[in-house]
Amino acid sequence: MKRIFLLACILITLASPSWATKIPSGSKYDSRIQYVDYNSGDVVLVRALPGVGARIVFAPGENIEDVASGFTQGWEFKASHNILYLKARSMTLSHSNQSIDMAPEPGKWDTNLMVTTDQRMYDFDLRLMPGRNNQRVAYRVQFRYPAAAAAAAVAAAQKRVVQARMNARPSPVNWNYTMQVGTNSASIAPTLAYDDGRFTYLRFPNNRDFPAAFLVAEDKSESIVNSHIDPSAPDILVLHRVAKQMVLRLGNKVIGIYNESFNPDGVPARDGTTVPRVKRVIKSPGENLQ
């Protein structure tokens, strides 16, 4: 008989709904300043005193859109951006042509509160407490967002990794360059030349003016080569070609640049770049990068 009774108690317990209101933790400086971690499945307890206001603070940048309660006659709410101010208030009842004022009374003013912001939904139990010096009440309940903070930290770390990859210098694959210096042209001669199979890199130190670069075709005709200055190394001129022969010109000065290990196939830039683990993605106008 005892076993049957015990089994029945267990079944009743398992079948009963689980109510576990989350109680904010008080600050070590003042217990009336309270903090609670956000969880969309929690109902948070807010304890107030008659005649004393309180506020609920949501995430910075979050904006309150809607506030609802089961006892709006007995509570006053005022929303301002991410802060909700609340206070128990008196209510007036009419009976037999008489008006009766009822002051907030602990135990009779308890209700629920629902807040919707532009980012989340919140649920609360509002409880009016007795005792003017009750230390369990809240002057402020402030939410913390550990999951959002962790996600932001991961995103920031990923961004740093991507930025580091973007800032990585391409790996040189060919240093075998020679040059022919024209008369009085030494001032535009590069001190370093290499390529990564896709672009050619020339160094011009000491704040020298960069010459224009021209591609020399088999018939000796010349065509200008697009170029840019390396943002991370302002003394490097990046030519958007790898060629067997190029010419540098600045006024009457001329330098011949010869690629002694020219590979017509170059490096197959399948990802659109020659930087490892960096892929070039072309998006349509207005399309967000993921």
Swiss-Prot record:
Signal peptide segment: 1-20
Keywords: Signal, Virulence
One protein family per Pfam: CagX
Entry keyword annotation includes Signal: yes
Top-rank taxon: Bacteria
Keyword Signal in annotation: yes
Entries under InterPro entries matching the protein: Conjugal_tfr_TrbG/VirB9/CagX, VirB9, VirB9/CagX/TrbG_C, VirB9/CagX/TrbG_C_sf
NCBIfam families in the cross-refs: VirB9
Family (UniProt): Belongs to the TrbG/VirB9 family.
Protein name (database record): Type IV secretion system protein virB9
Species assigned in the record: Brucella melitensis biotype 1 (strain ATCC 23456 / CCUG 17765 / NCTC 10094 / 16M)
Gene, per the UniProt record: virB9
